Amino acid sequence: MNQEVMNLFNPQAPAQTFDSIRISIASPEKILSWSYGEIKKPETINYRTFKPERDGLFCARIFGPIKDYECLCGKYKRMKYKGIICEKCGVEVTLSRVRRERMGHIELAAPVAHIWFLKSLPSRIGTLLDMTLKDIERVLYFENYIVTEPGLTSLKEHQLLSEEEYMIAVDEFGEDQFTALIGAEAIYELLASMELEKIAADLRVDLAETTSDLKQKKLMKRLKIVENFLESGNRPEWMIMKIVPVIPPDLRPLVPLDGGRFATSDLNDLYRRVINRNNRLKRLIELRAPGIIIRNEKRMLQEAVDALFDNGRRGRVITGANKRPLKSLSDMLKGKQGRFRQNLLGKRVDYSGRSVIVTGPELKLHQCGLPKKMALELFKPFIYARLDAKGYSSTVKQAKKLVEKERPEVWDILDEVIREHPVLLNRAPTLHRLGIQAFEPTLIEGKAIQLHPLVCTAFNADFDGDQMAVHVPLSLEAQLEARVLMMSTNNILHPANGAPIIVPSQDMVLGLYYLSIVAEKEPGEGMIFADMGELQHALENKVVTLHTKIKGRFKTVDAEGNPVSKIYDTTPGRMIMGELLPKNVNVPFDICNQEMTKKNISKMIDHVYRHCGQKETVIFCDRIMQLGFAHACRAGISFGKDDMVIPESKAKIVAETEALTTEYEQQYNDGLITQGEKYNKVVDAWGKATDKITEEMMARLKAVEFDPVTGRQKQMNSVYMMSHSGARGSVNQMRQLGGMRGLMAKPSGEIIETPIISNFKEGLTVNEYFNSTHGARKGLADTALKTANSGYLTRRLVDVAQDAIISEVDCGAEIGLTMQPIVDAGQIVASIGQRVLGRTALDPILHPVTGEVIVEAGRMVEEKDVEIIEKAGIQSIRIRSALTCETRNGVCAKCYGRDLARGTPVNQGEAVGVIAAQSIGEPGTQLTMRTFHLGGTAQVVDSSYLEASYEGTVKLRNRNVVRNSDGNLVVMGRNMAVLILDATGKERAVHRVTYGSRLFVDEGDTVKRGQRIAEWDPYTRPIMTEVEGYVEFEDLVDGLSVSETADESTGITKRVVIDWRSTPRGSDLKPAMVIKDKAGKILKLSKGGDARFLLSVESILSVEPGAHVKAGDVIARLPMESAKTKDITGGLPRVAELFEARRPKDHAIIAEIDGTVRFGRDYKNKRRIIIEPNDDTIEPVEYLIPKGKPFHLQDGDVIEKGEYILDGNPAPHDILAIKGVEALASYLVNEIQEVYRLQGVLINDKHIEVIVRQMLQKVEITESGDTGYIPGDHVDRIELEEINERLIEEGKKPGSGNPVLLGITKASLQTPSFISAASFQETTRVLTEAAVAGKMDTLQGLKENVIVGRLIPAGTGGMANQIRRIATARDELIIDERRKTSGSAEANAMLVDMTDNAAE
């Protein structure tokens, strides 16, 4: 009853339902229609009465009453006068809430330009009028006149005239012969007189005629804006404002502070300036003031309105009284504190609390401990309701009193309320979806929340003072979702890689590891036990220890569920662990009959989950945790300083290394080696010494010692156990404690030559301590930067991928990606099985030997299939991928494959984009921030030999080899590869071999694993001859193109080609070597060209003129120094660079066509290379390559499409353009994975593919056809396909386009939803663009829906939307049916009527 009475007084308007939001430019009429009255005075409120001034910025007559149902003068009070307008003060009697909704307006005495359309680049007004921004500003800010109507004079339209020129023109032609205006009126006139249709038609004609690229772009931009205006129905002159809207006063409040001062919103100041200047201008115009004064006032009005809309966009920033810039309307929307991100995307939550967390080892996995005090506060409304229902209280007030007194019945009721009512726990920063999980609360004393130890990994929590927030899901639906989807027991697997995330860590691992140790010569060795009872008995009587080698019977079940048992060689500790394994035929005792390191425990849990299901796994994990803690406690493993053993041989190794460094010093002083070489050698020597000491130390720690008295094995070294089990600590940390700290880096990243010889146990000397401070400081600064950078990367990723949702089951795509194992330096880093697990096969996967089908096309690859695939040695598999999915909005379930967090095929409505973004962003903080400098470091980057990674037979692809004078096989081909085939003839490995490598094997040889196949010099690129003959030099003139340089240290001279273009005399030389026969004729090469070898700068000549050379002999070498010292961008910056699709600094140049290399005429300091195609229909392609870049092609070399002309990191755009989408995908996936793999982070490929899909959504129109697009437009790929299908049906000409790769920021800003783009970055620009085009946001993605406050169209929200759609459709059908039936009834009635009349 009370509810209904309340509603009478406070009618709640029903929430509006809508499907889309449109934004456009407001016309003056529109602004007037919003307004409730004009604001004429700058006053706000009367400082004595605190009542708003009439016609002022807070006027009650315009905006509504200040108190509910009370007019300003107090004549009408209460509900009964609702809607009456007081005749004394003119205020309507209504709710004060209308002061948040009603707008006012200011009539401007002179029009002003809207700064967004003027200054937001590209300037809309400028583009429309085809004038530069500078010129328009000159007119707007009253510096120049502009000719709007030249009449018959010699002036041109849009010509700018200064004051003097205007006067001269008036004198010359007379005032009425032409029109020239100044200020916003002039621009208004120009815009109002534009005939958009005619302009658009003219532009189209010009576009068709123009040939220059630049002009075309300019015309296209203008045409686009003209068309936007035509399509949206906006008028260009609306960009000039004659009326300014004023936002409701309660959105820019004025709050009295104590002491008679006021706190006010900046907007009030800005509006005041506008009103003041406007009123002054009106008065001046009435007084007929001189033009110059009026003009100045108009300019000031323009500036005041500019500041109101976007302060600081033009000219000086307007500051308030306290020298702080005023916050304009634009600033209200922009940035992290703006309306979008602060209030629409991030809202405060009611019913929440936060407290410190402590560990709760006796909790079950689905529980958390909630302090009673907190629970009482959080569940208050529920408690009040229950108290009322049970008759303890009749009013809310009484219930409140009971709760405040904390009466015993309140606690009982709290227990009831809490039972089965899950709460959400959240730990900031929430980097992925496992940062919020649901638990069932259990009440505890104290004030800290208890958290289950196994979920710490997911929350990344520890108990050193972390805090967590608790939220209460209120509605039944929310509770249901929390229980079914977010319960900690439902999140056992990691969404990023599908491995278990509920894995014991630290103490638990240590306990389990200790349980599983096997020791020699323990009491009771060799005993046999029939069941656990006997074993427990023996253990308690100390007949055996946990580590004794025994035989034991392990009981499990077979496939039918009958009990079976088997005897194993094991230890009592392992038997205890085996007891906890679920009884299942697929869970053998072997998985815990091994050393339980963290990796093995994880494997065990995964195995149990895959074979026994979720419930069993949860129970198993809880038990294993209890066991781990119990035994970690019993084992009493602790960290003592004597556990860190310093190896005896340390002093010896250090002395040896010091002797070596002294020797290098001496060699340097004698001039035998350079400074750089000495540095490298010293650093290398110390690096080796550190490693040696570490090895010795680890050997000492690992060593098993026996007690001489009892003969039993002593307990293993505690620290070694901690490290080896994976509980805590690494070899690196142990080395610093017990070995030597080793080499340190300078802040610049270079390595300091003198290492730190001491370790922490011995203590550092002052100098050593000082040297080690650099690295420590850098590490701290790094961490701070890393967090921010990683968060920003995640934000961009989420933004680009938020609308990738699973929207249908199967798109029927017949394209996909080819998966192959990833091999790095001969080692397989990702096997093909790992890569295809949980993906859908595109073609049937066949067994290479028997030909039987392992996986049918369209089926998902499961674990059992992976085993068969790995055994069969399949090397490449075609799979479906999100990248090639053809679903219109979103991705289909078949292309995506398995939902990694559930281990089942993905459900419809799953927001895979956001999950992908989180999976890539979450480990961001673990990546390094640094760029690796490979200048002074000790590692040599380039490997100089190739070893076989498999046994098999050698096959040479594109074989092109010769034997040189030493009798070695030398590779002469640019794109030759060594293949190793297995017995069945399948490729096991493919290795590219570089030009000039020496081969140790030939076609058909068999190789063993680890056998050398080829070697080459990593520091020089050879130039070799492929014909035998006599060398002759061309254009190698001493002093001009060749100089003899003597090596200072060794005194050996070498002849080097120098830059001959630096002197005017040498400008047209082409230094080369030619090979001639005895008669002096130039020999021909196999490809038909002359045997002439052009030499580049810095080549070292290896032969003298007239020397006799054999095929395969080196005639010149090109040192590769420049390539060696490049910085490798690693870690986070590299990932960001790849996702942003930036071109690397020195990027590779890739051949676009197959053909022959020719050298063209050189450019200033660039080399021109032309590729002449093999196919005559294609144009030759030219490339310009900077001189001095190491460059290995010769005139006449044959090159294939996709080969590198110049080495380096390729630009992703080039890969896409030349090799296509699949090559690009595999490049990006592999490059990104490499960065994460270095840090040991596992991420499934499909997440990266989802992001890359979002980057490849657009195509650039090349042929517009009848699509209505302009070449160069970016259009959605699928949209273009749909338009083309329609055009082909109508018999018109379809358009075509090339796929373009957009970086994630660009792609986010190009989403079809302007709301989503505006909330991401560059808010003003996005909104300006959207308003001009009159864009419609159909609210398809997640972000837009959050902003307008609807359920997101993913997950349960997606289902709700679907059900709603079905219901609406059904309603319409029912209504139609009713209409039909009622319609026929009416017709019958009319018939009856007519017959009656006829009868009368």
UniProtKB/Swiss-Prot annotation:
Q: Where does Mg(2+) bind?
A: 462, 464, 466
- Provide the GO biological process annotations: DNA-templated transcription
Cellular component, GO annotation:
DNA-directed RNA polymerase complex
Entry keyword set? DNA-directed RNA polymerase, Magnesium, Metal-binding, Nucleotidyltransferase, Transcription, Transferase, Zinc
Annotated residues that bind Zn(2+) 1 are located at 71, 73, 86, 89
What cofactor does this one take?
A: Mg(2+); Zn(2+)
The reaction(s) catalysed by this protein are: RNA(n) + a ribonucleoside 5'-triphosphate = RNA(n+1) + diphosphate
Q: Report if keyword Ribonucleoprotein is assigned.
A: no
Stored Gene3D superfamilies: 1.10.132.30, 1.10.150.390, 1.10.1790.20, 1.10.40.90, 2.40.40.20, 2.40.50.100, RNA polymerase II, clamp domain, RNA polymerase Rpb1, domain 3
Q: How is the cofactor bound?
A: Binds 1 Mg(2+) ion per subunit. Binds 2 Zn(2+) ions per subunit.
**Which cysteines are disulphide-bonded?**
none
Gene Ontology molecular function, alphabetical: DNA binding; DNA-directed RNA polymerase activity; magnesium ion binding; zinc ion binding
InterPro entries recorded: DNA-dir_RpoC_beta_prime, DNA-dir_RpoC_beta_prime_bact, RNA_pol_asu, RNA_pol_N, RNA_pol_Rpb1_1, RNA_pol_Rpb1_3, RNA_pol_Rpb1_3_sf, RNA_pol_Rpb1_4
Highest taxon in the source lineage: Bacteria
Alphabetized HAMAP family for the sequence:
RNApol_bact_RpoC
Q: Its function? A: DNA-dependent RNA polymerase catalyzes the transcription of DNA into RNA using the four ribonucleoside triphosphates as substrates.
Q: Which PANTHER family does the protein's record reference?
A: DNA-DIRECTED RNA POLYMERASE, DNA-DIRECTED RNA POLYMERASE SUBUNIT BETA
The family line of this record is: Belongs to the RNA polymerase beta' chain family.
Record's subunit section: The RNAP catalytic core consists of 2 alpha, 1 beta, 1 beta' and 1 omega subunit. When a sigma factor is associated with the core the holoenzyme is formed, which can initiate transcription.
Q: What is this protein's record name?
A: DNA-directed RNA polymerase subunit beta'
What is the organism field in this record? Answer: Brucella melitensis biotype 2 (strain ATCC 23457)
Q: Upper taxonomic classification of the species?
A: Bacteria, Pseudomonadati, Pseudomonadota, Alphaproteobacteria, Hyphomicrobiales
